[in-house]
A protein has these predicted regions:
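Substrate-recognition element of Asp-dependent hydrolases with the DxDx(T/V) motif
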Residues: 17-21, 26-57, 69-72
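Surface-exposed amphipathic alpha-helices with a cationic face
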Residues: 30-34, 87, 102, 106
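Substrate-recognition "cap/lid" segment bordering the active-site pocket of phosphatases
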Residues: 45-95, 99-102
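Conserved phosphoryl-transfer catalytic core
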Residues: 1-14
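Pocket-edge positions in alpha/beta enzyme catalytic cores
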Residues: 15-18, 77-78, 130
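Acidic, Mg2+-coordinating phosphoryl-transfer loop and its flanking beta/alpha structural elements
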Residues: 91-135
């Protein structure tokens, strides 16, 4: 477990992370959503130590798109579940790659769009459902 955490931490500090590009089409799609949304948040499972790198990446690729970045600290003792954050912010919808997160949000009357992949790639953890979407 410690080795896994160190690998993830090292990745966020790496040049490889800094050079990551968003999935094709997402910058444009988020811009369109921004035109119609009062507020847009990033709710990510990343741990707090990746905040600076994540904010820098978001500013570069998605300038003036999101109102705030919320880190849930997944897989730590300080984790806050995404559906709880959505409820506390009174969000009406979420886009997420986790079927579990989308299901919990749906149960709270939050519209959920479960992204299961892009192009010819399907995420290995994805579940086919009526919520399932791809970025294409």
């Amino acid at each position: 477990e410690l080795e896994s955490r160190n690998m993830v931490h090292d990745f966020y500090e790496s040049e490889a992370f800094a050079k990551l590009k968003p999935i094709k089409g997402t910058c444009k799609q988020m811009g369109h959503l921004r035109d119609y949304a009062d507020k847009m948040y990033i709710v990510t499972g990343r741990q707090s130590y990746a905040r600076d790198q994540t904010e820098q990446w978001l500013r570069y690729w998605f300038p003036n798109t999101f109102d705030d970045l919320i880190m849930t600290n997944s897989y730590t003792d300080h984790e806050i579940e995404k559906h709880e954050i959505c409820r506390s912010l009174a969000l009406d919808s979420i886009i997420d790659d986790s079927f579990d997160v989308c299901t919990k949000c749906n149960r709270m009357n939050i519209d959920a769009y479960n992204i299961i992949g892009y192009g010819d790639i399907t995420y290995p953890w994805s579940v086919q459902s009526s919520m399932a979407r791809t970025w294409d």
